Amino acid sequence: MRLKAGKLRMWIQMFEHINNPQRVLPTLKRKNENGHRVYYDEDKNRYHSVTTVVGTIDQKGLDEWREKVGKDVADYVAIRSGITGTKLHKIVESYLANEKSEEENIFAKAHFNNIEPLLANIDLINGLETKLCSKRLGLAGTVDCIAQYKGVDSIIDFKTSSKKKKDEWIKKYFLQTTAYSIMWEELTGIKVTQIVILITGEDGSREEYIRNRDDYVEELEEVIAKYTEQ
């Protein structure tokens, strides 16, 4: 069964947020340098984009796919997926912030309606679309959600897909959220080891992955080292 857009379901305020006045996160500015996304903090420290770094682990497969389907098709799919993903994130952010969304993109609305049942597992939200960085890792990025998921403090990321994923296809998502977990701990002193990936597929699939970040720290460090050696 494929996704159907329909109308965005109306919602009322239901998510509780945690306000911590002692928590001060750095101000990060994003730039593009030589085709690569980087971040700078207030002290001019430079950080690689976590998305860019972990994306290198499946670059070979992506290049092979682009060659197979052709540049025009690959560019179209990438652009459409990027737009849909961005708009879905805005809808989800509004929803979790107890605000109404006016988004009209039919693909994003369909994905939201598909993933909404999983969002009911979220509570006690500590941050939405929060910019983080780690001097230890040399990485920075924006985490979708920091909250409890099924009663456990978690780093949560939302993803769109054309179809149901296999575990081996989404290793970079686990590495990405592991990086966010380390960043959050470094900046706040709060250790959050549960990482959660929620994926909505165009084929109507809805996937929930719950992992422990400690299972991915070593591999993340290896990927970072390989990237910085280039």
Write out the residue ranges for each language-model feature.
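Mg2+/Mn2+-dependent nuclease catalytic core
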Residues: 130-229
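Metal-dependent nuclease catalytic cores that hydrolyze phosphodiester bonds in DNA/RNA
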Residues: 3-140
